[in-house]
Structures are given as C-alpha cells and as structure tokens.
Amino acid sequence: MAWYDEAVFYHIYPLGLTGAPTENTYGEPVHRLNTLLPWITHIREIGCNALYIGPLFESVGHGYETTDYKKLDSRLGDNEDLKAFVKACHENGVRVIFDGVFNHVGRDFFAFQDVKTNRENSAYKDWFCNVNFWGNNEYNDGFSYDNWGGYNLLVKLNQRNPAVRDYICDVIRFWVREFDVDGIRLDAADVLDFEFMRALRGVANEVKPEFWLMGEVIHGDYTRWVNEGTLHSVTNYHLHKALYSGHNDHNYFEIAHTVTRLYGMGGNRPDGLKLYNFVDNHDVERIYTKLNNKAHYAPVHVLLYTLPGVPSVYYGSEFGIEGKKEKFSDASLRPALSLDEYKDALNNNACTKLTAALGHIRQASKALSYGDYQQLLLTNRQYAFSRNTQDETAIVTVNNDDSDYVMTVPCGNHTVFYGMLTGQEVSAVNGTICVNVKANSGEIWLTNADKLFVADPAGGEASALVTDGGKDDAQGQQGKTEQGTTDGMKVKTEAEEERDQAETDRTRQNCGMEAGTGGMGAGSCGDRTELPETCTEAGNTKGAGYEQQGNAKDTGCEQPGNAKGAGYEQQGNANDEAHEAMDRALDEAFERGKIAGLQEAILAIMERNGNVTDRMRQDVYDNVYHDSLVNWVKSFR
C-alpha cells in the first residue's frame, strides 16, 4: 500500500495562483511562492493529503517552455523558497509532486543557445529533433527544428539521445536530493518516447521509495502507459468528459459505460488502474462553468471521490468558481486567488463544505481506495455501485434528477449501513437496502460504524451539502433525515416515473440492452462517448483539423552512436546487427507514416492479436496525434 493509493490530490498552477507576470524578465527573485504557505492548511482542511504543483522551474512565459530545470522560476522566488515549501507540506502530512516538462524546452535553454551560437559544431545539435541548418524560422535562426504544438518557442527534445536521457534523469535525482519531491507529473506523456519513460521509471524506483510517476495522456489505451515498467498512473480524460456530459445530458449510462471500460483495463487488480481522476484542471473549463445545472456539482463530486482512481481537485473549484476557456488564452482558467476572500468558505459555501466532507470520507474508507467496483443500479438519472474490500463495503448512490428517488440496491451480507453525508442509518432487509436519494445529490453508505463521519467540517448538519448544490448555504436544511425510513420524503409522481421509464427504455434500446437489466449489454452505448473538449472527435483519418506534427517527414531524432533508438524493448540478441538494422528501418517507416497509415497499421496488429470491437476501432481513429500513434504502433513490439 503506497501513499499514492490513498491520496486525495490538490492541484495548484503556481504562476496563476500567485498572480505572477505572464512574461519572465529573468530579474531578481520575487518570493511569491511563500504566499502559498497558508494554502497548506487549507489543503488539509478540505481533506487533501497530496499536492500536484507546477510548472515551477525557470521559463519564458506560462511555465511549459523550461529554460533551467534546476532553478525555481524567478517570478516565484528561489530554490530555498521551494525547499521550505515542500518541507512545510511534508510537516503537515502533504506529499508533493512536481510538473516535469521533458518533451520540449524553451529557446533560452542552455543547449539550444549553444546550437544557435555554434551551429553544426555544437555539441548539443543532436539534443533536438530534426535540426536542419539549411532551413529557417520566424526567429531568423538560420536553421529549423521540430517544435511542439506548432510553436517554435517550444523546442522538441530528442528523447532517444542518451545524453538527453541522462540529463533528464539527473534532473529528477536533483529534484529529490534538493527538494525532497515525492513524484512527477509528466507533461505530454502521450507523445514521450516509451524507452525514455522506462528510463525515468528506473530512476523513480532508485531515488526514493514509492516515488510516483503520473503522465498526461489525453486518450487511447491507458494500459500502454500504466504498467510495471512505465508509469504508475495517467490523467483520466475519458472520465473527465463523461462526468460533466453525463450530467448535462442526464445520461448516467455514459458514465457507467466509461467506468466499466476503464475498470476492465485493470486486469486482476481489484482497484483498477488507479488513474488520476479530475473534473477540471489548468487546461480545461471549470466544472462549475461546464455544468448546465449547478446543483449537479454535488453528484459529480460524489462520483469523483468514490469511483476507482485517485481523485484531484483543482485550486479554486472547491469554492465553485467559474472559468471559461478562451480562444487564445487560458488566463481565466488560472486566476490569482486570495484565501482571505474565502476565509468563511467552510461555514457558508456549500461547494467547499461538500468537497471537504468528501476528502475526509475518502481518507477514512479503505474500500474507496482499494475496493473492487460493482454496478448495482443504473437509469438515465440514477446510478449506484459498490466498492468492496474484505473488511468493508461502500455503496454509492447518486441522483441527477430534480426530484428525490427511492433506491433499492443489493448489499450482500451486511446488516447496517451508515450515510456519511447525511448521518442516516439504514438496515438491510433480505440482502437489500432501501434508501432515499435527494434531488441532485449523492450519498456514501459505509458498513463500519467506527468510521462514521457526518460530513460538515464546520459542525452543522450535512444534508444541505448534497441537496442545495449552490454556493450559498445560508438557507440549507437543518436536522437529520429520519433514519432507516422513507416516511415523509418526497417520491416521484406516477407521471414522472412513466417519463423516466420511457427515457430509460429508449436509452437501453440505443445501447442494445434488454429492458429491465441493470448492466451494460453487448450494444455500443459507449459509441456516443466523446473526447474531452481539448480534442475534436475525429471520425475520419484527416485529423479533424489538427495540425499534424511531422506527419510526412522523418523526425530527425536518430540516436547518436550505437545505442538503440526504438521506443520499445528490443527482442532477441542486442548484438544482432541485422536485427537492429531491421528495427531501425521499421522505426523510420513508422515515423514517416501519415496519420491514416499509422491508424490502419495499429488496427491490423490488433486484429491479428484478437477480436477488435467497435469501441477499440473508434479509439484508434480518435487518436489523431502523429507522435502518439508512432509510439502506439511501436508498443506492440
């Protein structure tokens, strides 16, 4: 049981939260990081025990164009500030992971500056991809190079160069030695070279017990990254999209299908892949903005904290703040905030109280961290599932309807369950419990009485946390609901029941399910699952308007010397020159391949290995990133 298995993360984008300038003048350090010290207490108060913070290191602008991996960004302070901050986190029981931006660097990075000065004679010319001294760019460098995202201010590192790999591995060792960091979130992990990531995993295993590697992966088969030899976890963008759209559309089938598919990727692990779950971050719109019905904040967050995976809350979202993604700027997603503005949030902000309650409940329950997942009930508007360990069962019930709903769900051999948010106690009858789930709310039912935690950290009653849904809770309900009964509770009218049944039957028909079944059938309900908003769904091989990176040319990232340059483990005798030559030829062919050809190659290999479902086929066509597809096809070997 590693620390990250029971982690509840808080996510801070420090340049935004501290109000740092958007451009770095490389002047004297301004000690803004110290202003985040009071946030450590807040992080603990809302039930978090881990912090993902970044980017942190010297950069040109938004933090992802690193110029010095071993120096805190001068807009935030100096290295002593960062040491003190991590130490304070540890003293308060908060683990810390940094943002590791290793796919690309900024133009002021020392090695790139050397290439600009010494050109062909630079010792670092092979540190970057496809450097062409016959080309040019908008900076009039007199040469061209591969960039990231179409921006020449982001210079793509050649991760297959042993010197680059060794340098980055040394950076990780430095971060642990200097700052005592507990893990790293790998930026753009879905296009990082697999051999490079395996080298990072080797360093992670070496530098510190339970050092955690989590990667940013937008889509695809997460098991390609999450395994014993590569990363511990990746960002769960599939669930992120399902959580908000499943509530906006009143379609719990989408969420349940996504959960079932992702949980199945975990193989024999009862707790699944332990993906990094979130409802918003520094790249996507705030959940409070995304939700059509703000009352859905409650059931969305109940699911975030109880489904398989590691939950995370993005700074400010616990207050219910809004943030809409703009066409040419993410500034509205990364605002400066002051805790003084929210000093009474735990008393009068329903979003904050619910978030805090869920964080503490999550940490109190082993079942929510380690339990298996079993779906118990599913309609368009209601959803129930259990998380089970040998010693504890948690049953989670959510309702996205504007009316209360009475659920009867199986509960195994347990006799009594305790509502952690409402304080209710219900007794089992013939292996089932009957519970009332209030409108636009959720509840977590646990079997262990000694873990009972009635949710309001401020000392009031908790039922309003999941019924009001808004941010102002002055008129919240007082007093507990009656225990073990539905007397006096609002239930649906006959007309409402008929409406919901008709809607449910239509969904089941669309999903290929027989009426009256609670589980997913063989149909393709999940075919309606879309990509996150950061991606346009691609139903064809043209990439839906994406600029393809290097889709018709060699990357120029050949590994110098006689080291291997394939993104996979070499099979057979490493000294077999003919074998290596064949592998290099295949690599070059893949890297020159176009999007459509790479997709068809992946599908052909998958079909050779077994049956390919419509969902698997759609996953391939949804991936329209050249580098990601190249890594995918190499991962089969």
Which stretches of residues belong to each language-model region?
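Conserved, mostly hydrophobic/aromatic
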Residues: 12, 43, 53, 69, ...
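Long, intrinsically disordered low-complexity tandem-repeat segments
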Residues: 517, 538-575
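Substrate-binding/active-site clefts of carbohydrate-active enzymes
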Residues: 1-9, 13-49, 56-178, 200-206, ...
